[in-house]
Amino acid sequence: MENKKKDKDKSDDRMARPSGRSGHNTRGTGSSSSGVLMVGPNFRVGKKIGCGNFGELRLGKNLYTNEYVAIKLEPMKSRAPQLHLEYRFYKQLGSGDGIPQVYYFGPCGKYNAMVLELLGPSLEDLFDLCDRTFSLKTVLMIAIQLISRMEYVHSKNLIYRDVKPENFLIGRPGNKTQQVIHIIDFGLAKEYIDPETKKHIPYREHKSLTGTARHMSINTHLGKEQSRRDDLEALGHMFMYFLRGSLPWQGLKADTLKERYQKIGDTKRATPIEVLCENFPEEMATYLRYVRRLDFFEKPDYDYLRKLFTDLFDRKGYMFDYEYDWIGKQLPTPVGAVQQDPALSSNREAHQHRDKMQQSKNQSADHRAAWDSQQANPHHLRAHLAADRHGGSVQVVSSTNGELNTDDPTAGRSNAPITAPTEVEVMDETNCQKVLNMWCCCFFKRRKRKTIQRHK
């Protein structure tokens, strides 16, 4: 092919040659001659549907199968690149239950791109849908699955370190895994078994905070190295968040982020488990007491923890039928999903202007605690409304970039340039990433109820 004049804003104009395989690829891809941005040989990039601590998320389409996918894009010049590491962790995890499938990783112009399975709404989105309280039955069905999910992650020599409702998603409506709770976003994960020595990482103190302050373990607040016990304690805090509707350490005020995180940690330590779990089954307190007493190196007894909740589940006479509290409700269809809101489409410029104004007002937002050389990024406008409810604030960006065909949201030729959101160093513990935290887009107004085999 003849050399073309260089253009700083465009990648290679050639269409990548078709390939039947997906996975890691070192060949760069970019805009085709038709102006459509491509990732790999067969993934077309569509509209922006969200952003996170990696960069931004785009809707995509596999041109070979006509299936929609999620495409994570991270600037190659990122100060703390993590997408390649996350890809390696996904490959390490393989195809376990509730683990998103990864289809491709490779360069895309000035970006690294990872193509993943597209999932449904997050537990935080569904929590909002259910008036911010889950029933005991729903929490137990979630808990039983997530203990197994975390056990699987740990079995692959990884600790997760980022427990929060926004990182647990149901499957896409109509999919056979639509009621399975998936775990996503391994940007903060870490190997706790040294791959060379095969030994557990050493115990250390004076570590910087990594994770989401609202849910992280007490030992993490104290600067102790995280291990398997901390993932399970964070899950316990999240379970109580679902049952109670909020946690005692939410909404604390302080002059600085450091003081705020200190207050959160102090309040966690000062809140007896009996008080935190008051008016709820004793098993909730038993769970937290057990995980908080674990030694740094100790392997948790996952079967014991699961049995706590399965026995309670059976004693209450519940059936594991996946009839969650949100079943029968209309699932959220966020701005930027496949189904365009006509009003939003016709008033795109007004919405973009509003989003820019909101972004300028929230530059000093205190968002989730993600030190350890990690990055954070602005989130969707809906998150701002939720953050107000919790006394927090977040940065906002528009997620409606690009004019896209309503029949095929990845077919647009006038997508706005992919730009990296403003980088900041810390984020507030409210971490209201909402619908667009990862690839949680809903493509159908109503879901089909479908009973699937019980997950352990």
Swiss-Prot record:
Lineage: Eukaryota, Metazoa, Chordata, Craniata, Vertebrata
Active site (record annotation): 162 (proton acceptor)
Compartments reported by the entry: Cytoplasm
BP-aspect Gene Ontology terms: Wnt signaling pathway
Biased composition annotated in UniProt, kind: Basic and acidic residues: 1-16, 348-370
Keyword vocabulary terms for this entry: Acetylation, ATP-binding, Cytoplasm, Kinase, Nucleotide-binding, Phosphoprotein, Serine/threonine-protein kinase, Transferase, Wnt signaling pathway
A Pfam family of this chain: Pkinase
UniProt-recorded Gene Ontology molecular function terms: ATP binding; protein serine kinase activity; protein serine/threonine kinase activity
Composition bias, Polar residues: 22-35, 395-417
Oligomeric and partner information: Monomer.
Binding of ATP, residues: 49-57, 72
Domain spans labelled Protein kinase: 43-314
Post-translational note: Autophosphorylated.
Sites of Phosphoserine modification: 414
Organism: Pongo abelii
Stretch list, region Disordered: 1-35, 342-375, 392-418
GO cellular component, as recorded: cytoplasm
Family, per entry: Belongs to the protein kinase superfamily. CK1 Ser/Thr protein kinase family. Casein kinase I subfamily.
Miscellaneous section: Triazolodiamine 1 is a commercial name for 5-amino-3-([4-(aminosulfonyl)phenyl]amino)-N-(2,6-difluorophenyl)-1H-1,2,4-triazole-1-carbothioamide.
Function text: Serine/threonine-protein kinase. Casein kinases are operationally defined by their preferential utilization of acidic proteins such as caseins as substrates. It can phosphorylate a large number of proteins. Participates in Wnt signaling. Regulates fast synaptic transmission mediated by glutamate.
Protein name from the UniProt record: Casein kinase I isoform gamma-3
